[in-house]
């Protein structure tokens, strides 16, 4: 029985197989020649026509058409009885017969109803479940490039993982089960092709908390969705492991002796922390619950930093902070809604015609509307995901540079924004304060003090983040070097091998 580790991330996902000796990373994105990860975003699209409307909607439209025909029959009858000329009566009689034929021609009425509904339908009005059931899927870089070329042809789900613990109705749950099942089935297919054998089981990483406010209720829902998706994708067995504990199992392979270790995993969507007793002698045991001294987590990830950098570093060049004629500022919600790539209702609202009209009206009551016009361009062309992605690239560049020039020419020719490492620090400070509070919580809940610390996840590559954690918090604690992007998934693969 073959088992793989799956790091299903907020920003990127990864699959690794461990044979007991070495790790094999599964290539997931053919357009990414260097790495083994794949964007977690999914583009669901229609190349030609949109899907037909649901049966209930068609039947309601048919009933409406029948009411209109019935009214026309009544009017024709009135005309017949009021007509004096036999020829005129014959004309009304023919009209009545024709309308009665239309009234009872159900197939023709259904075709007409579908045609009218399709004509009036826009992509944003299609429920997500219907989109999942009828649309085509594009993953990774291919999906993101397709989205950039034809945003009006589909919908980009920027981070499916961010919705798993949220408040969802029945159809929305089924939609995300369908989306994630497609992704997991693709991961399984890639693994089987590259390993040359059937993959039956998986250990999937999970954050300590999937959602910021729904607590254990959100966690239960998220695990249910992931479990159903894995089954639908063809896995016969699936287990879950807290992501910081998975990272601990990877670093445990390098330790010469028993060591109490603090793991700080700062990923794209969440920050997860644990204090754990690691031991080379116990590394092959399946159940390590007694070794976990403390674990905590929260939805505080790199995506929050990206959105914060948009608001602090980019939005001021797009009209944020400008005053209207009445002295009030341009509504700041314009810009938070623009960044809401992980909030489908908010983003759908931002892309609506009414929202664009509201921005246009605001442009008419400010002295210099040129900056706000950039926001309108983003709104009209559905460029939110691209703006947030630009902020992510800026954040990564500022890990090694003091200043950068960020090109935003897809919004406006020659539109560049200067961003410094100092401005990034200011943008990240509120977020970093919350991360530090989470570290304090984990340390206070642990019965033992850590001897070393491992900081992992994409945000661990930022010197701003590491310096902030060591300032008056982790001072003097030796730091274990690790692979920031692969430690979690390699640890998941180690655990998967125990289940195989």
Where are these regions (language model features)?
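Flexible internal linker/loop segments at domain or repeat junctions
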Residues: 407-409, 415-418
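Phosphate-binding glycine-rich/basic clefts of nucleotide- and phosphate-handling proteins
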Residues: 30-31, 35-45, 50-58, 62-101, ...
